[in-house]
Amino acid sequence: MQNEKITQELIDIRNACGSRVVLDGKSHIAPIDDKAFFDKCLIYSESKNLHAKNTVAWRPMSDDWKERCRSNSFWFQNTVAEAKKMFPEMDERLFELKARLLDFAGDAVCLPGYEEDLDDILEYGQFWLGYNAERMRGEACQCHANSARIWEQNQDKSVICTGYALSADGMWRQHSWLIHRKPRSNKIVETTRPRVLYYGFALTPEMCERFADENF
């Protein structure tokens, strides 16, 4: 169990790393918790809102791909009971995460057998749009190491985030990225390929240090 200091640090960094939104006529940085909040607020500004929201789009999965996933993958099953027939050790909260992601966007969530950050993702997670992410190209399929390297070089203005990202093929996958902290807004820093949407939590400085030690 986390102590109160770490819990407050995670809450503070979560709020600080939110998105620029306009709600009730006021512009501020706030976490996008879910689709309901996303729908009722303006993203960035009134002039940018429609374009920003229209970027949350993806190619529907083909029937053949769905059938392969259904036959081979616990995470594609419709219920916890069905998933546990294929993977009895599954943490049932993974399906809570799956529902949270698919309620917002996408067709499927490629879940791991074990998600070591599940508690923090569920407790402190938020959504970010990916269409205007800064690109700092790293090694392919090495998002954790890439993010660790960039953070090591930019600790004063960046924060590592980890969780899941939605690709244009409609699949959410495990992913890590960074937030570039700016005076008036925050921007995703993507080190591999473009993503439609992100969901995860921002790490505290101590967590970033540990993440970098383990991944870079």
Would you name each region that the model predicts?
Residues 2, 59-216:
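A structural boundary/capping signal
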Residues 2-64, 69, 138, 210:
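Short, glycine-biased loop/turn motifs at secondary-structure junctions and
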